[in-house]
């Protein structure tokens, strides 16, 4: 505990990026404890819980009358999956609350750039899909399916190693997304969000070459806003803490589909 407090005392500044602090904190905890995947059981249970809700979410997506309707509903389901997060004060979820959130996702949509994202997707040929958490990745399959139905080549990226409850290759297999995507790669590292000076050459090549990028979760929202983006990124996440909610100018516990830059 002393080492963690010492780290926070050193790194916690007004300009600090929360995702960067999270990466350093969790790496330190793993090193001290000797446990490189403390969320392993929670991730497995999250995948199992999400898989039980997948058919329900898919039915809602398929209720969309047009391709654009189904795309938007799939975006909403993917955002709702982002609710499956641990260790955030005041943020809780159950299977019942998730089912309700899936059904009422549009009511909580505070930033809606899905129309712009759809138009970009229609013109694109290749997409990089940056996943966030285990459990959540199950719902991501619905959006990957819709992108594939639009004729896009979809490459899914998971983390290169355990960091909090972020999805890894093991979760890509468990969720079924590996069967839907054209290819699954890793970032080559285990950072919260995206830290470009740590990623692998393979990931960086894909990141620089695709036409469009979808990025899930607050970690990517926190880190991508630190870069001068050169191509369109669609951020899909739930505002589960006040700093992120305030940055995007919305209330807490709202759904966000934000096109950047």
Features from the language model and the residues they span:
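Short, hydrophobic/aromatic alpha-helical segments in well-folded domains
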Residues: 116-120, 130, 139-143, 202, ...
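A short secondary-structure junction signal
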Residues: 132, 138-143, 167-169, 225-227
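Electropositive, gly/pro-rich neighborhoods at or near active sites that engage anionic ligands
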Residues: 1-124
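Structural motif
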Residues: 126-128, 211-212
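Histidine-anchored nucleotide/phosphate-binding helix
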Residues: 134-156
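Residues at the starts of beta-strands that form the adenosine-phosphate
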Residues: 125-126, 152-156, 232
């Amino acid at each position: 505990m002393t080492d963690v407090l010492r780290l926070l005392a050193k790194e916690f500044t007004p300009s600090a990026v929360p995702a960067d602090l999270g990466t350093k904190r969790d790496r330190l905890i793993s090193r001290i404890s000797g446990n490189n995947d403390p969320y392993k059981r929670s991730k497995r249970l999250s995948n199992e819980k999400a898989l039980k809700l997948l058919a329900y979410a898919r039915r809602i997506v398929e209720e969309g009358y047009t391709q654009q309707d189904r795309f938007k509903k799939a975006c909403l389901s993917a955002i709702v999956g982002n609710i499956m997060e641990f260790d955030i004060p005041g943020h809780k979820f159950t299977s019942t609350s998730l089912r309700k959130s899936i059904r009422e996702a549009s009511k909580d949509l505070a930033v809606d750039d899905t129309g712009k994202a759809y138009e970009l997707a229609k013109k694109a040929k290749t997409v990089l899909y940056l996943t966030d958490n285990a459990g959540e990745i199950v719902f991501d399959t619905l959006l990957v399916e819709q992108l594939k139905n639009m004729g896009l080549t979809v490459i899914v990226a998971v983390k290169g190693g355990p960091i909090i409850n972020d999805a890894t290759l093991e979760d890509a297999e468990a969720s079924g997304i590996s069967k839907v995507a054209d290819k699954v790669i890793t970032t080559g590292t285990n950072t919260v969000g995206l830290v470009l000076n740590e990623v692998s050459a393979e990931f960086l090549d894909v990141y620089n070459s695709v036409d469009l990028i979808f990025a899930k979760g607050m970690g990517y929202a926190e880190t991508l806003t630190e870069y001068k983006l050169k191509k369109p990124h669609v951020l899909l996440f739930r505002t589960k803490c006040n700093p992120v909610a305030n940055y995007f100018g919305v209330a807490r516990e709202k759904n966000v589909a934000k096109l950047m830059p």
